[in-house]
């Protein structure tokens, strides 16, 4: 393990211990409402993420089936056009980089999940995830996790950030995280308490935003840089496989039949919200 990796791990562990020791959250760190100025700045950059409120991840009171038997899988490639995002401007570009929007588009991911499964394979044992700010961008810009996941949120920029995490649709504030220096980390168990889409914004850099999809079952994936996804250990049957990406008005359902020992394929391309 390198020195930088060790430092990052130690910081994450300290943040987790601090979060566990706190019975409440400081108003200066969490629970605050974004200022009117922050809302106006975001509106000026014309980021329309209202469609995220239309995404239903399908709570089904999932339970593990210890006698699952033979299963199948679904895989494929999703290459949908991501929307343009506003670039940074002025002095911010000297700190954040000159092309944050292009980087965000290149790394855009699509959510893929199966609906209608109330039982199946076990949930992930490891319920810890990382989120970071790099060049004033959220990485990964789209992430998926299960209910109960603890997030370690890092600031890798030498500039101030104030991340606001809200629930899509209701816009209820889940957490507010101010960052004052590079290397700072905050651990939070608030972001994945229940299923749904969580929106991420920075009040200081309105083009900085991302999404966390929180599921109460394990049958989901996020496409990688090449657009590929894979969901395994699926009980045999016919399912609706949902696909959603920023820019789509609502998730697209795709009917897929999965046989025991087989692998179904789902490939999509074209414009988002076709």
Task: List where the protein language model places each region.
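Extracytoplasmic copper-binding redox domains, predominantly the cupredoxin/blue-copper superfamily
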Residues: 24-274
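C-terminal motif of bacterial Sec signal peptides marking the signal peptidase cleavage site
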Residues: 18-21
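Bacterial N-terminal signal peptides that target proteins for export
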Residues: 2-11
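Hydrophobic alpha-helical targeting segments used for export or membrane insertion
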Residues: 14-16
């Amino acid at each position: 393990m390198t020195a930088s990796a060790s430092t990052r791990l130690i910081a994450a562990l300290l943040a987790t211990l601090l979060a566990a020791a706190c019975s409440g959250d400081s108003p200066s760190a969490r629970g605050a409402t974004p200022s009117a100025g922050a809302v106006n700045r975001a509106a000026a950059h014309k980021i329309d993420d209202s469609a995220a409120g239309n995404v239903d991840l399908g709570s089904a009171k999932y339970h593990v089936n210890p006698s699952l038997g033979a299963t199948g899988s679904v895989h494929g490639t999703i290459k949908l056009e991501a929307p343009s995002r506003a670039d940074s401007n002025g002095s911010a570009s000297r700190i954040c980089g000159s092309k944050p929007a292009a980087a965000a588009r290149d790394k855009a991911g699509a959510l893929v999940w199966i609906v209608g499964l109330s039982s199946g394979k076990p949930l992930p044992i490891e319920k810890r995830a990382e989120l970071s700010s790099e060049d004033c961008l959220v990485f990964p810009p789209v992430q998926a996790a299960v209910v109960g996941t603890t997030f370690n949120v890092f600031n890798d920029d030498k500039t101030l950030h104030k991340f606001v995490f809200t629930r899509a649709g209701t816009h209820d504030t889940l957490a507010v995280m101010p960052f004052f220096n590079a290397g700072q980390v905050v651990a939070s168990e608030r972001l994945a308490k229940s299923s749904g889409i969580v929106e991420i914004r920075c009040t200081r850099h309105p083009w900085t935003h991302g999404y966390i999809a929180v599921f109460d079952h394990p049958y989901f994936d996020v496409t990688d840089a090449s657009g590929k996804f894979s969901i395994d250990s699926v009980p045999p049957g016919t399912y609706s496989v949902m696909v959603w990406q920023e820019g789509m008005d609502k998730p697209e359902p795709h009917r897929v039949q999965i046989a025991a020992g087989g692998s179904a394929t789902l490939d999509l391309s074209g414009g988002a919200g076709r």
